[in-house]
Amino acid sequence: GCHCESGMPIHKTTKLETNNAEIAALAAPRPLKLISVGGDWTKNTPKVEYPYAQSIYKYFNALDKVENSHFPKEKHGYEYIKRQAMYPFMAKHLKLDTTGVLDKRSGDYDETGNTIETTQIMRNFHSATEMPVHALKPGSIVQFR
């Protein structure tokens, strides 16, 4: 998997164990879009994680707020086809005006006005030594009081 979102240190510690389905379902009843592909660990999302998320959303009477778009022939990444699946979901739930970005004939959203930032620009901290002294260290247990 990719360290960008599989986050194994948060899945299993000496004191707790969870999985992506449980973490995703924490969003309930807020809108949740699961985008999955056949070429990585999300390949089972339509049969495992998505039905689990639906079962949690059902408790909140919010089945209309959870969706899955699955691309069985795609590999890991967030390419154009996957972003195109996300845009209508976001437009619906954020009540966005799609005028000027949605091509009503093709159904595609125009991305030409988007700026792709470099990794360096997007980072809050450029190294572990720049993190605040009070920041949680990897593997820390969060305690609620």
Model-derived regions: residue spans:
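Primarily recognizes the serine-hydrolase "nucleophile elbow" in alpha/beta-hydrolase
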Residues: 1-16
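General secondary-structure edge motif
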Residues: 3-7, 33, 69-70
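Beta-rich catalytic cores
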Residues: 19
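Active-site-proximal cofactor/substrate-binding loop regions of enzyme domains
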Residues: 22
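Alpha/beta-hydrolase-fold serine-hydrolase catalytic core, especially in secreted/extracellular enzymes
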Residues: 28, 35-145
